[in-house]
Amino acid sequence: NKILLNDYIKINRLEKNVKILGYKKNPYPFIKYSNVLVLTSKYEGLPNVLLEAITLKRFVISSDCPTGPKEILDNGKGGMLFKTGSYKDLSKKIILYKKQHKLVKSKIYHAYSSLKKYDLEKNLNLYYKNLTKFN
C-alpha cells in the first residue's frame, strides 16, 4: 500500500534517501543520480529499466519474477535477486548492499560486461542471419 509506505518513510525520516517514483516515461535522470535501483515487479517481460541502470553502472536489486531480471542479472551474478513479494528478503539484500562494497562492485562490473548481448545491431544481425536461413 503506497500510503503506508509513504507514512513509513516519513516516520523514519527517510525522505532524503528513499523516493517512491512510480512509472516514469524517461527514468534516466532519476537513475543517473541514484546509487541503486530496486525493481519490485511481480511480472516482467524485458525490464528495460534494469538495462538502463546497468548502462549507468548502477547496482540493481530485483525481484526474481518469472521472466527478465534473472536473465539480465545472470542468476544474481550481475546484481541481487530477492524472492518476489518477500520484503524481508528485499530488506536483507539492501542491508547486504550497504555492507558488501567489494561484492557490489564486482556485480556491477559483471552486469556492465554482460550488456553486449543486448546490443541492438548485434541482435538485428542475428535475426537477419536466422531469418535468411529459410530462403
Feature map (PLM): residue ranges:
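Nucleotide-activated donor-binding/catalytic signature segment of Leloir-type glycosyltransferases, i.e.
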Residues: L5-G22
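Short acidic/histidine- and often glycine-rich active-site loop of Leloir-type glycosyltransferases
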Residues: E52, C65-G76, M80-L81
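A short, well-ordered alpha-helix in the C-terminal region of glycosyltransferases
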Residues: D89, L96, L103-K117, K129
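Aromatic "clamp/platform" in nucleotide-sugar-dependent glycosyltransferases that forms part
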Residues: Y23, K42
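A short alpha->beta transition loop at the rim of the catalytic pocket in nucleotide-sugar-dependent
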Residues: N35, K57
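Short hydrophobic beta-strand element within catalytic cores of glycosyltransferases
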Residues: F59-S63
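Conserved acidic donor-binding segment of nucleotide-sugar-dependent glycosyltransferases
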Residues: D74-Y87, L96-H101
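C-terminal alpha-helical cap of glycosyltransferases
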Residues: L120-N135
